[in-house]
């Protein structure tokens, strides 16, 4: 239990409503205010969660008791809203993706450093026990030298998904949202980068095959990683029925297959019945972004995904888009 409660405010009450509920359930955190442009939505959330509400972001930022802001607005606004909060002296966490533009991520990182505040990105899969154990197994060399990583995400999103939301249609527009790689696929891009490390080269293709949208509903890419591994990506939102998501990790000594958040396969050449349970998760490891922010703000711990780490997936999906536009391989250095 923390020695004091840290005051939180949440901006945007779509997915942000779930994070506001998480704040209420987390020891050491206190939800003080929620903010949404829709007065009825903000009022209803405040009544449920027993906190204040406002339709004015500036008003919430003026509150000295609100130390941490969670940003859950359209993707193209993430860093602008984060920067506004950090300039007001607030610590910030942003829902995925960090933004849709690398330069905006860079600006937010600079502001966080200048203002001396915490900047984190909410990639919930980083807190999952299985994913932590896979990462530990890879770091321990259980698969040996990594050779290949394949990501397949084949989901179903109907036209109403893109036409709806608030503001209406924002998920379909390049200015406010990326497509299947930047929106749905970014969780898995982040896992790939976490598991294998930085990408060296990207050859990508993106297009819109089945929806009336500006953004893409399919992205494909071939990757090389700095550790020598190769990789491939398919991220699509027109697969009916949804075929889910899968990550296959192949090394010299064996293979791990991650399927929809579960362990599909763990086989090693020279060991029968290997188990990821050999890798223990520290008891004090944060279980979600709220616990992570409390640890970062109160004890100075580094969040699971800070600004620099959150930027990496934005750089990757933008490289896929750039390669698709130019028809050339993008070298990320």
Predicted regions and their residues:
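Beta-strand-loop-alpha-helix segment that lines the small-molecule cofactor/substrate pocket
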Residues: 68, 74-75, 79-126, 141
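C-terminal helix-rich "cap/oligomerization" subdomain common to oxidoreductases
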Residues: 1-2, 68-71, 226, 295-333
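Contiguous beta-strand/loop segments that form the cofactor/metal-binding neighborhood of enzyme cores
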Residues: 183, 187-262, 287-302
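N-terminal Rossmann-like dinucleotide-binding module
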Residues: 1-48
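Conserved SAM-binding strand-loop segment of SAM-dependent methyltransferases
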Residues: 50-59
């Amino acid at each position: 239990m923390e020695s004091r409660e840290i005051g939180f405010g949440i901006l945007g009450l779509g997915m942000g409503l779930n994070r506001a509920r998480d704040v209420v359930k987390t020891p050491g955190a206190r939800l003080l205010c929620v903010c949404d442009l829709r007065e009825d939505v903000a009022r209803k959330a405040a009544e449920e969660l027993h906190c204040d509400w406002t339709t004015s972001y500036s008003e919430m930022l003026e509150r000295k008791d609100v130390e941490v802001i969670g940003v859950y607005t359209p993707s193209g606004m993430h860093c602008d809203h984060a920067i506004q909060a950090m300039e007001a002296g607030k610590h910030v966490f942003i829902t995925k993706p960090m933004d849709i533009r690398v330069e905006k991520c860079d600006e937010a990182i600079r502001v966080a450093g200048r203002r001396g505040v915490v900047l984190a990105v909410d990639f919930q899969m980083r807190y999952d026990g299985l994913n932590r154990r896979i990462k530990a197994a890879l770091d321990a060399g259980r698969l040996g030298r990594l050779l290949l990583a394949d990501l397949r995400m084949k989901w179903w999103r109907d036209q109403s998904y893109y036409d709806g939301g608030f503001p209406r249609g924002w998920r379909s527009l390049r200015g406010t949202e990326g497509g299947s790689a930047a929106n749905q696929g970014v969780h898995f891009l982040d896992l790939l980068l976490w598991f294998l490390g930085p990408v060296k080269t990207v050859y990508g293709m993106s297009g819109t095959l089945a929806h009336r949208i500006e953004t893409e509903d399919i992205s494909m890419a071939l990757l090389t990683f700095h550790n020598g591994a190769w990789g491939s990506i398919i991220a699509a939102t027109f697969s009916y029925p949804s075929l889910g998501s899968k990550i296959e990790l192949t090394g010299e000594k064996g293979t791990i297959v991650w399927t929809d958040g579960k362990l599909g396969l763990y086989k090693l050449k020279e060991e029968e019945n290997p188990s990821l349970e050999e890798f223990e998760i520290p008891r004090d490891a944060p279980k979600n972004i709220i616990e992570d922010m409390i640890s970062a703000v109160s004890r100075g711990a580094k969040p699971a995904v800070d600004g620099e780490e959150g930027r990496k997936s934005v750089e990757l999906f933008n490289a896929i888009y750039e390669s698709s536009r130019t028809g050339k391989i993008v070298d990320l250095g």
